[in-house]
Swiss-Prot record:
Protein name (database record): DNA mismatch repair protein MutS
Record has 4Fe-4S as a keyword: no
Cited Pfam families: MutS_I, MutS_II, MutS_III, MutS_IV, MutS_V
Recorded family membership: Belongs to the DNA mismatch repair MutS family.
Residues given in the record as ATP binding sites: 607-614
Gene Ontology annotations of biological process type: mismatch repair
């Protein structure tokens, strides 16, 4: 395409677009942002806006689409959610200042990982950008959040890369454009950069200049050992500089993260435990949505961070626990006060990049004053002492903002009335000129009436014609010679006088001067605030931490969470543990014990589908996870030994993008666990081997269980339907059988959801199918085939599946409506009698009594 064949404005656009070929360009044209050529076609499709044309190039109409500049944020938000980056090109020159088109330039680039505008961000989600730099041995990771100032780096390996990205939940991933770049499971939000931008030497130079130091050893980074991590951090910092058109002032140092800081969880574990997202991709009900009682958005984001980063440092955990205990009598008034706190963290970020708005500063001022009034009793908690000591440090900033910013400023700086009265004498004088014009006009009107003797004379103003003197048609002919005609109306004439024109010029000039001065003063306030960014970020972090800790206190008090104990020996002991999410979704939840130690490391868990095996296993993992965040846990008591990682293999689905079947996904996850789990790991395995034939599945499940017992020696919960596996405790002393009980009566089945010793006796598969609504004909056919299989199993001896039962007598007709014989009824009566015998009403707490009452009621219903 030839530039000479288009207008000067389009030539300017093409020059700007050539520098941003991989982005959509929002090109400012008056009150619109316009897009051209392929950008217009793509934007019209993504945003559902009209595609039209503007001008021609080489005789071909130029495709064009546009959005109003005042509504641009909503369109940008939609594009960013789709993973698009947008270059914002503004008019920076004066209209008509030269012969060519008004000067324009790209003032910022909006990308998924570098957002600071509140309209483009989810309130309760942290927005991170991650850079990935590989070499032959390691992968260097660096990540940052422009909202919080977080800036960290880490060394990892190829096999752990996807797990790290799942932990960080990156909105944008920077990758070198080279053949050595590893393949990622996610392709969304990926930005390719030239490989040379990840060079360690260039990265170290940029980082040392930014932090004002000679080398990076103070950050724990050695030039040779951490070269790829330094390269990633340098590429990331440079990318932020390029997209924001400035070097950010608020990145909070650079820290090197290691695996030993947090309990490890791979991507499958985070997904299966539904920490912040359900298996179906929803935000609720999840662990996060269930626990989030936070009063601020900052607190909610920190809570999500803590849930994804359970601590291993016992001292830090205990410090949080002590703070939670200290707040149990104070959390309600504290949360009431915190509800008045704005999102200081994100306001500070907008101050840092220079796009804070007037009401941001007003909200910051009010929030800092509110924080300074928080009065807490630390009750021996050193963490609370540290947190509450932060807030008085920001009082000088609050006082400055009180003096500088109107109590309720305008939304936009261009509308004026932002800088407070008394802050600047010249601005006050300019405002006086504008605001006291009414007095001048009244005085002028009275004076002119007296001078001219014209009774219809009025002095008025409108935005089109400015100031004027109006006379009726009958008196207009008597106007003095110094009255210059300005406008003729049907029944009146409007005039201007030299005195009124001089006043008009003064007022208009004062308005322009006041707006210009307000902008200058506002920019000065922002610049001064940038020097206080460390204190603001510190206050934001302290407020968020207080919010989360008070939420933990609320959970302890209102949901009967207890403080877990930590041991230095291998143990997971939980008394009457509850699933923190499920118990909020059901009327009655059955609590269960868990006992794992050096004598019992693997629990073989059997029982019917829908019996609660998966819920129980997840419950144990979530209690362990919560304990390591400093939160109290849903149980009567809990003692937990050293834990380094949590693994889960629960459920699976096809990975069509990678051409992997459900069974292949299952085996890949299992292999990862067997290669990485240690003696201090917690492993959840659900029905390993079910995706293939019975013999293959049984063999694989047996091998996996033995590997966990003999090699990994991890704490393991192993749910299975293979009866052969229940013999493992005979050969391995550290394995133990447990089952979830259920009862059948007539056509009904009752799931007791209670963990009991020993293996389950049968599957209840057909009963569950009946509950699911299978047709009677299909159920009868299933019962018939089950009996035939049982006959074959009895003849061939091997009993491969726990679903097998004793074969029926020859000649017996299968009866789908008869699930329980008299022996089972007697067995049930024995269970009920034993349960009643064991009850000691005087020793039960109200909650325990209620739980037992519901359980006995369910038992009675099953035989009624």
């Amino acid at each position: 395409m030839s530039k000479s064949a288009v207008s000067p404005m389009m030539q300017q656009y093409l020059g700007i677009k050539a520098q941003h070929t991989d982005k959509l360009v929002f090109y400012r044209m008056g009150d619109f942002y316009e897009m051209f050529f392929d950008d217009a076609v793509e934007a019209a499709k993504l945003l559902d806006i009209t595609l039209t044309t503007r001008g021609q190039m080489d005789g071909v109409p130029i495709k064009m689409a546009g959005v109003p500049f005042h509504a641009a944020e909503q369109y940008l938000a939609r594009l960013v959610k789709l993973g698009k980056s947008v270059a914002i090109c503004e008019q920076v020159g004066e209209v008509g200042a030269g012969k060519g088109p008004v000067e324009r330039k790209v003032v910022r680039i909006v990308t998924p990982g570098t957002l600071t505008d509140s309209a483009l961000l989810e309130d309760k989600e942290t927005n991170r950008i991650v850079a990935v730099s590989p070499d032959k041995k390691y992968i260097g990771l660096a990540w940052a959040s422009l909202q919080s100032g977080e800036f960290k780096t880490k060394l990892t390996t190829v096999d752990k890369l996807d797990d790290e990205l799942a932990r960080l939940q990156a909105a944008e991933i920077l990758l070198p454009d080279s053949k050595n770049t590893p393949q990622l499971q996610t392709a969304s939000g990926v930005t390719r950069l030239n490989a040379w931008q990840f060079a360690a030497d260039a990265g170290e130079k940029l980082l040392t200049e930014y932090f004002g130091c000679q080398d990076l050893r103070g950050f724990g980074l050695d030039g040779k050992e951490h070269a790829v991590a330094i390269g990633a951090a340098g590429a990331l910092l440079n990318y932020i500089r390029l997209t924001q058109n400035l070097m950010p002032q608020h990145l909070d140092g650079l820290s090197l993260e290691t695996d030993s800081q947090y309990i490890g969880m791979d991507a499958a574990t985070r997904r299966n435990l539904e920490i912040t997202q359900t298996l179906s991709g929803k935000k609720s009900p999840t662990l996060m949505s269930t626990l989030d009682l936070c009063a601020t958005h900052m607190g909610s984001r920190l809570l999500a961070l803590w849930l994804h980063h359970p601590l291993r440092n016992r001292a830090h955990i205990r410090a949080r626990q002590e703070a939670v205990a200290a707040l149990e009598s104070q959390y309600k008034p504290l949360q009431c006060r915190l509800k008045n706190i704005a999102d200081i963290e994100r306001i500070a970020a907008r101050i840092a990049v220079g796009n804070a708005r007037p009401r941001d500063l007003a909200a910051l001022r009010d929030s800092l004053f509110a924080l300074s009034e928080i009065d807490l009793s630390a009750n021996g908690s050193s963490l609370l002492e540290t947190l509450k000591a932060v807030f008085p440090e920001t009082l000088p900033v609050a006082e400055t903002l009180k003096a500088a910013v109107m109590p309720e400023p305008a939304v936009w700086l261009k509308d004026g009335n932002v800088i407070n009265h008394g802050f600047h004498p010249e601005l006050d004088e300019l405002r006086r000129i504008q605001n006291h014009g009414d007095e001048f006009l009244l005085d002028l009107e009275a004076k002119e009436r007296e001078r001219t003797g014209l009774s219809t004379l009025k002095v008025e103003f409108n935005r089109v014609h400015g100031f004027y003197i109006e006379l009726s048609k009958t008196q207009a002919e008597q106007a003095p010679a110094d009255y210059q005609r300005r406008q003729t109306l049907k029944n009146a004439e409007r005039f201007i006088t030299p005195e009124l024109k001089a006043f008009e010029d003064k007022v208009m000039t004062a308005q322009e001067q006041a707006l210009a001065l307000e902008k200058q003063l506002f920019d000065g306030v922002l610049k001064n605030l940038q020097t206080a960014l460390p204190q603001l970020q510190k206050a934001a972090k302290a407020a968020a931490a207080l919010d989360v800790l008070s939420t933990f206190s609320a959970l302890a008090k209102e949901r009967n969470f207890v403080r877990p104990e930590f041991a230095d020996y291998p143990v997971i002991h939980i008394e009457n543990g509850r699933h923190p999410v499920v118990e909020q979704q059901v009327r009655h939840f059955t609590a269960n014990h868990t006992n794992l130690d050096h004598k019992h490391r693997l629990m073989l868990l059997t029982g019917p589908n829908m019996g609660g095996k998966s819920t129980y296993m997840r419950q144990v993992a979530l209690i362990v996870l919560l304990a390591h965040t400093g939160c109290f846990v849903p149980a009567d008591a809990a003692t937990i030994g050293p834990i380094d990682q949590i693994f889960t293999r629960i459920g699976a689905s096809d990975d069509l993008a990678s051409n992997r079947s459900t069974f292949m996904v299952e085996m890949s996850e299992t292999a990862y666990i067997l290669h990485h789990a240690t003696e201090q790991s917690l492993v959840l395995m659900d029905e390993v081997g079910r995706g293939t034939s019975t013999f293959d599945g049984l063999a694989l499940a047996h091998a996996v269980a033995e590997h966990l017992l003999q090699k990994n020696k991890s704490f393991s919960l192993f749910a299975t339907h293979y009866f052969e596996l229940t013999k493992l405790p005979e050969a391995h002393a550290t394995a133990v059988n447990m089952h979830l009980s259920a009862l059948e009566q007539g056509q009904d089945i009752v799931f007791l959801h209670h963990i009991e010793p020993g293996p389950a006796s049968k599957s209840y598969g057909i009963a569950v199918a009946k509950l699911a609504g299978l047709p009677v004909r299909a159920l009868k056919s299933a019962q018939k085939h089950l009996n035939e299989l049982e006959d074959q199993a009895a003849a061939n001896r091997p009993q491969l599946d726990i679903f097998s039962t004793m074969p029926s007598e020859k000649g017996d007709e299968p009866n789908v409506d008869s699930f329980v014989d008299k022996a089972e009824e007697k067995h049930f009566e024995g269970i009920l009698a034993a349960a009643l015998e064991k009850l000691d009403p005087d020793s039960l707490t109200p909650r325990e009594a209620l739980s037992e009452l519901y359980r006995l009621k369910d038992l009675c219903k099953s035989v009624s």
